[in-house]
Amino acid sequence: MLNEHGRRLLLGPTTQRRRLRQILDREDCVTMATIFDPVSARLAEQLGYEAGLMGGSLASYAVLGAPDLIVLTLTELAEQVHRCTRVSDVPLVVDGDHGYGNALSVMRTVHELDRAGAAAVTIEDTLLPRPYGSSGKPALVSFDEAVARVEAAVAARGDSDLLVLGRTSAATLNGIEDAVARFKAFEAAGVDAIFLPGPQQREQIDAISDAVKVPLLMAGAPEALCDPAYLATRRVKAWSAGHQTFSVALKALHDSMQLVRSGTLSLHLPGQASKQLLEQATGVPEYDEWTRQYLAGGA
């Protein structure tokens, strides 16, 4: 909807956050869109997604063309989040990684992502970035530090509607007992929901769902677990099987560039977006209205 000046009326961060909270109160499980830039954010809204997920890997790919090794800065992440939230009403769950440092850094991370318009921020207890001399195997910070990080994240919210999600990979790295203990401690620290990355078995999801009362969100799982009906029974309210849509887009770009490099005329490339889709994805109708109102002069 446009206002009298031709500006599309966005709901604003608080309303988006309340929409996400409403999703967490429902009985079903929604699929989150992969969002990594303003175009994907607009498409997610136009296609009717109720929530989106910006993974740390996606942000690093889109902003730096770099792998997910914590070389992206907090400033760069917050800027990319804002670019997405300023054009779309889809509530955005943002991967805050380890919070870019200790508990004080976590507070700064939550503050900046709050200002950028994130609907929810995940904070994890993985030891990041990879320390010197490590074998490359992921490791977790201590139990006490993990809880302190989450407590700091909850305290740092400027808007009480911003959701803080506690995340740990303990089920994969240390076993389900440690994962359950950490998630229960995160719940006691005040998180709004648990974010479960990469579960491999239903038994893991069942154990965590039985141990906590707050809702669950999930991302990355084998095909056997990609069953929204089952996930809904375990109080998983939003999920993503992975970021394969980014992979598909990358392959399409690679293949089309390869065809042009080999002599195909770009006009003849297969699979091109229609003019209408391109204009919808880039906000052309809105800009056309502004142009008519403010650049036409006396014509």
UniProtKB/Swiss-Prot annotation:
CDD domains: ICL_PEPM. Its cofactor is Mg(2+). The keyword Magnesium applies. Mg(2+) binds at residue 95. Coiled coil: none annotated. GO terms for molecular function: magnesium ion binding; methylisocitrate lyase activity; oxaloacetate decarboxylase activity. Pfam families: PEP_mutase. Binds 1 Mg(2+) ion per subunit. Substrate binds at residues 57, 167, 243. Transmembrane segments: none annotated. It catalyses: oxaloacetate + H(+) = pyruvate + CO2. Keywords: Decarboxylase, Lyase, Magnesium, Metal-binding. It is an enzyme of class 4 (lyase). Its EC number is 4.1.1.112. InterPro entries: ICL/PEPM, Oxaloacetate_deCOase_bac, Pyrv/PenolPyrv_kinase-like_dom, Pyrv_kinase-like_dom_sf. Belongs to the isocitrate lyase/PEP mutase superfamily. Oxaloacetate decarboxylase family. HAMAP family: OadC. Homotetramer; dimer of dimers. Catalyzes the decarboxylation of oxaloacetate into pyruvate. Seems to play a role in maintaining cellular concentrations of bicarbonate and pyruvate. This is Oxaloacetate decarboxylase. It comes from Paraburkholderia xenovorans (strain LB400). The lineage of its organism: Bacteria, Pseudomonadati, Pseudomonadota, Betaproteobacteria, Burkholderiales.
